[in-house]
Amino acid sequence: MLTALLVMTGIAIVLGAALGYASIRFKVEGNPLVEKIDAILPQTQCGQCGYPGCKPYAEAISNGEADINQCPPGGEEGIRKLADLLGREFKPLSEEHGEEKPKSVARIDEQLCIGCTLCIQACPVDAIVGAAKHMHTVVPALCTGCELCVAPCPVDCIAMTPLPETLETWKWKYPVFDLRSAA
């Protein structure tokens, strides 16, 4: 019995060491451009760009399969940052993918909520907490404002509430100079 235990422990140690070595030796580096693009995107995972999340959209941009102006939550600021990073010309937000809206979070009217869990299943970032047949609530710090939870709600108890403007959320305007009149 003791011999079998020692043999199994020895095998586990050897295999663990082999896996640890293999993970270091055969590590696959990702595309650094994809990582930079993904860092600029708002991480709402809303799918409004036509891709299932921000990372696939970043991969499509880096491969030249998608344009930089398909992300409504990122808005004009995100498009400008992507244009600067990729050395492309700025383009306005594509209307077929939506329109830029003020940052908002979902709010559930807990008096109307029937606890169906459809909104929990729809939320890509797990910002809604609750259990079946019990009221749900949104954790505002986690909510990205993607609006994916609104449509599945059978009793329409979810509303998008705009965030109040603070120094962090205020849209600072870019200075615009007319070069022709300045000369």
UniProtKB/Swiss-Prot annotation:
The keyword Transcription regulation does not apply. Keywords: 4Fe-4S, Cell inner membrane, Cell membrane, Electron transport, Iron, Iron-sulfur, Membrane, Metal-binding, Repeat, Translocase, Transport. GO terms for molecular function: 4 iron, 4 sulfur cluster binding; electron transfer activity; metal ion binding. [4Fe-4S] cluster 3 binds at residues 123, 143, 146, 149. Its EC number is 7.-.-.-. One of its GO terms (cellular component) is plasma membrane. Binds 3 [4Fe-4S] clusters. InterPro entries: 4Fe-4S_dom, 4Fe4S_Fe-S-bd, 4Fe4S_Fe_S_CS, Elect_transpt_cplx_RnfB/RsxB, RnfB/RsxB_Proteobac, RnfB_subfamily. Residues 29-88 form the 4Fe-4S domain. The keyword RNA-binding does not apply. GO terms for biological process: electron transport chain. [4Fe-4S] cluster 1 binds at residues 46, 49, 54, 71. Residues 1-23 are annotated as: Hydrophobic. [4Fe-4S] cluster 2 binds at residues 113, 116, 119, 153. Residues 104-133, 134-163 form the 4Fe-4S ferredoxin-type domain. Belongs to the 4Fe4S bacterial-type ferredoxin family. RnfB subfamily. Part of a membrane-bound complex that couples electron transfer with translocation of ions across the membrane. The complex is composed of six subunits: RnfA, RnfB, RnfC, RnfD, RnfE and RnfG. PANTHER family: ION-TRANSLOCATING OXIDOREDUCTASE COMPLEX SUBUNIT B, OXIDOREDUCTASE. This is Ion-translocating oxidoreductase complex subunit B. The lineage of its organism: Bacteria, Pseudomonadati, Pseudomonadota, Betaproteobacteria, Rhodocyclales. The gene is rnfB.
